[in-house]
Structures are given as structure tokens and as C-alpha cells.
Amino acid sequence: MEDFLRQLKDAAYDLSPLDIIPNHLYLTNVFFFENDTPDRDSPFMPHEALVASLYDSLQSFPILVGCLQPGVTTTKLVVDADNPNLPSWETHNVPDVHFGRVKTRGFHRESWPECINITDPLVHAEDGAASPKLLRVRVCRFAGNSGVAVVVRLAHCVFDAKGCTFFLNYWATCCRNRLKPGSTEAATPSPPILDRSVMYACLPPSVRPKPLGWLLLPLSLVLTTLVRVVMFFVGKKTSTGTSRALLFCVPRRTLDEVTKHDGQDKKSRLSDNDVVTALFTMAYAQMRQAASNGKMPRKVTAIVPCDFRHRLGVPQNFTGSCAVGLYVTAPLALLLQHITPSSLSEVAAISRRSVDEVDIKVIERFSKRAMLAIQLLGDKARDLYSLMVCQAFSNQSRLPFYDVDFGFGRPLFVSPMAYSKSLAVIVPPPPPSRDVYVYLTLEVEAMAHMLRNEGFMAMVKRVY
């Protein structure tokens, strides 16, 4: 830590509108590592190596020791070298839970120690601190030195999901290098790009942030006040309500069966993501139809993120939010059909067309919309998103969560935790499986209705 503090300098990072909208949330993941070495006396994944390598990695990620500094319609992350916002670190020893027991139960959430069972997605300061931690780490050590679970919570305003895995693998590489100093196996990870101006350089000038003109300031104040009033009366409908989260597996056979019914041009085949989007959107629409006593709009919209790094040439090591939310809209009559491979294929085709149509103009349009919302409402713009009655998705299925190796082997199981309700997070399965996992968070009653949907349940398996 001392080396990190010596080289730390004051800095300020202007967040983009894409960062500001989710700035009230953490990205949370838990990693399960098994100690399968014969020598059970040596500490597995020793505390000193994990902490020291974390601070090694922070030399390239000083943004993580910054403090949120909101303006009227802007937000910055400010690093104070004399008073950094250092990560929180907790260690829990669990003498009554053996890693083997959790593994035998397929990492079912009911088998987890209570210390890693986190449900709150919100960023907030604790213990009277002036600013919330941007990075929280919690380590659970199982009985008999049998394994370790590592929970990492990263503020969403700092990273998107891709930036999150970039940081996690960077930290893991630093740990491996520290364990074998001078080894030919030592790797030099590519440095991250934290400056949001790198993303703006790939976007049209019209999309780049502009200061709010003084003529618009009164309008901004009025709109912000109106949003506060609306949220006061309908707060129970927002992302902070009572929710339940389950992890589903969409088997490979289900995915393949749906794509067999695909009648589209073979140049644009349905992806796994299209099928998953269709499946959970149909189930969500059917749940909403039952809850609304038939009072539903003729069309239902799902929000599907589209990472535009590769489309616009934004460097892959850019770690800030770099995705726009596409609106995939399908007729209600189609969504209310019984869920079968054939009906799923029809809805999935709509998702595929929406993604295929993404180009610079689409990205520019959505970015401008986010920019205007932030200009006028600041971080209150997120409240408007929380009021949307639609299924939202986060596609993380291709991200290298299972490559995170601190020098003691890769994780046997990785799971997201603590997400907002009405969000379906698509994540990779444990290797070598080719299934797709989906972590779904809904209101308690809504989830109960989903579980009673026979068509939906025929297409999935519950992991927990």
C-alpha cells in the first residue's frame, strides 16, 4: 500500500452520461475458488498476497480511490492524494461450512455462508463516511482451508461490466506476478484507459458533453423537482422495492431447438442472446398481463444493451460505460403466445433485427438522448429509467469472469449478485458448459408468477 500512496497524484475524472445513469449501483460478483492442493497447511490464497496485489493494480486504476462529486447536471470522480477513498476489505472465517459442501450442492445459494449473501445493489456511504467506497472486497475462508469465496463490488459509475472484468483480471495478473517475481511466466497486462475523452473522440462532435446554458437552467430545476415529486408518489415501483433473485440455466438443447425454427437469412442467424432476450421478455410480458388484469399496451419493450467499442473503434481497454440501450419492441399478441421454440424464434428475430440495425446514426441518436437527459436532470435521469415498465437485460455472457486466476487456479463458479429488479443479467456458465446462465431479479410476486409459467419453466432449469 505504501508504494501506491507514494505515487498517487490528485486527479479528476469527468463521468459521461452513460456512467452517471447507473452511478447509484454496484456491480457485484462472487468467485468460488477450491483448494485442491495436497498441502492443506499452507494458507490458500493468502491475505497478504491478495491485498498487496490489489494495491499493485490500483497504481493503474487510481480512479477507484476517488470520491463522487456531483454537480447540478454533471458528476466527477475526484482523487485526493492526501485523503484517498481507499477500498474496504473484510475477511470472514467460516469454521462450520466446508467448501466441499457448497460444491456438492452445485453452489446453490442456500448453501452459501451468510457473510457473502449480499442483496442490496445500491451505492451508499457507511460508518459516517462522507463518500461511498468505489471498491469493496469481502473474502470468505471456508473450513479446513478448503477454499475461498471472494466478493467484489465495483461502483458502476467507474466501470461497465467489460471494464469490471478488465480490472478483475488485471488484479489477478498482479497477484500471479507477485507470487512469482522475476519468473518468465510473469505477464504485463495492458494498461486501462480511464479518461472518458477517449470514447468521445470516437463519437460525432454533436454527442460530446456541453455545459448547460443559463437559459436552460430554470427548466432543469423545474424538471428535476417534478421527477422528485413523481418518485415520492411511485417510489414503490422503482428498483429499490422488495425483490427476489434467481439464477436460471438455459440449456444448450433449448437454444439449438429455437434456432432450428429460424427462418431468417442465414447471414444473420439468431444468437444465444436473441433467444434469451425473447424467452425472458415473453415470460415478463405474460407476468405483467396477469398482474394488470389485461390492461397492457399493444406493444412491450425490452432494453438490450449494445456495446459499441468495436463498432466505433473505441479501444477494448477503455473501462468506462460504453453501451447504449436498444429498445426491442414486440407486439403484445406475439409475446402472449404459449412459449415454444417456434414462438420464441419469432420474438428472437425481432431482437436480431434491432441489433443488426445498429450503426453510427443509431448510436449517435441514443447517446444524444442520454446526454440531453443528463444535461437537464443530472443523476435524476436514472429515476426515469427505473419507472419504465419493461424487461431490461445486461449481456455479460462473453466476458472472461472464469479467467480470473490469482495464481491458485481459476474459479469453479462465478455468480452475479445484488442487481436492480426487472433486470436479467446474462452470464457465462461454468466451463466447459455451453449453456447460458441468466440472473433474474424481480419483485417477489412477479417472480412467483414467472415460476408458475409452465412454458417458461419448460425452457429453463433453476440453478438456485
Q: What are these model-derived regions, one by one?
A:
Residues 321-404:
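Helical lid/core segments from catalytic subdomains that handle acyl or acyl-like groups
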Residues 37, 41, 266, 334-341:
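Active-site rim elements
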Residues 18-28, 223-236, 317-327:
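Short, compositionally biased low-complexity segments
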Residues 311-318, 330:
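Divalent metal-binding acidic/histidine catalytic loops
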Residues 290-302, 360-371:
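Short acidic alpha-helical/loop segments enriched in Asp/Glu that coordinate divalent cations
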Residues 1-210, 242, 256-263, 270-293, ...:
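Non-catalytic N-terminal regions of enzymes
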Residues 205-268:
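Flexible, P/S/T/G-rich "lid" or insertion loops adjacent to the active sites of thioester-utilizing
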